[in-house]
């Protein structure tokens, strides 16, 4: 069967309509899990690095762009190996959209969480003795929380996370559709992630990603850990909604 040049380029880049789907031997699956761990490691490193060490004047803009750029770069780097999820909510949303094998969900999520936690451990070590006991307070500040950053409470944080994660999945499914221009999916996904961080950092410190929330909460103290449930439930709920809606919109 003769296929168009755009479709061939998309398949060679790993951004097929079956986004994130992997096949083949155990060795290939091991590489896919390693790619997910490395990609999530890079994402959480971007969050920690930008939030902890960027100039105060840069604020949320630095964090938002760091996250977007990290996902864009890693999607091009390893997206053809694993599909470039780097996010348990994305994995589950793609299952809801019929784009990913549910049997691979648990290994993917474990790899993502492991990569994120390792990144948080490294940045906790980088802070070292410079801040003493203040390291815990610093990680609390970059963890996903509600109620402590202003007037936004549990309901606002939950709704924000559901909405932005649903929109994120709709975008992912759309830009990886067979009918979408080839080669641009990582750019659109990275820019969308930047936008959603700009929107949600003042409300919930921007999660969209349970692995990212877990990673920073590990060193964020009791407060961050006690609120962690929201940043698993809301993004996953939003991702499933977005997966179902995205599948409906892209049906041919």
Report the location of each language-model feature.
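Membrane-interface helix-loop junctions and terminal tails of multi-pass membrane proteins
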Residues: 3, 8-10, 15-252
């Amino acid at each position: 069967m003769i296929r168009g040049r755009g479709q061939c380029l998309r398949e060679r880049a790993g951004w097929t309509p079956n986004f994130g789907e992997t096949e083949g031997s155990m060795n290939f699956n091991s590489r896919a899990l390693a790619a997910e761990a490395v990609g999530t490691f890079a994402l959480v490193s971007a969050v920690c690095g930008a939030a902890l060490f960027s100039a105060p004047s840069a604020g949320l803009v630095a964090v938002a762009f760091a996250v977007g750029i990290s996902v864009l770069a890693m999607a091009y780097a390893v997206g053809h190996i694993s599909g470039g999820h780097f996010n348990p909510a994305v994995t589950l949303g793609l299952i809801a959209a019929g784009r990913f094998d549910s049997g691979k969900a648990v290994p993917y999520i474990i790899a993502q969480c492991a990569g994120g936690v390792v990144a948080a451990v490294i940045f906790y070590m980088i802070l070292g003795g410079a801040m003493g006991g203040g390291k815990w307070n610093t990680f609390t500040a970059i963890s996903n929380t509600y109620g402590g950053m202003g007037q936004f409470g549990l309901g606002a944080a939950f709704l924000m996370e559901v909405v932005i994660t649903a929109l994120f999945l709709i975008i992912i499914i759309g830009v990886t559709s067979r009918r979408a221009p080839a080669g641009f999916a990582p750019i659109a996904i990275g820019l969308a992630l930047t936008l959603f961080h700009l929107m949600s950092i003042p409300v919930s410190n921007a999660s969209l990603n349970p692995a990212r929330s877990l990673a920073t909460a590990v060193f964020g103290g009791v407060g961050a850990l006690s609120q962690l449930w929201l940043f698993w439930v809301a993004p996953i709920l939003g991702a499933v909604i977005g997966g179902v809606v995205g599948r409906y919109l892209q049906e041919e």
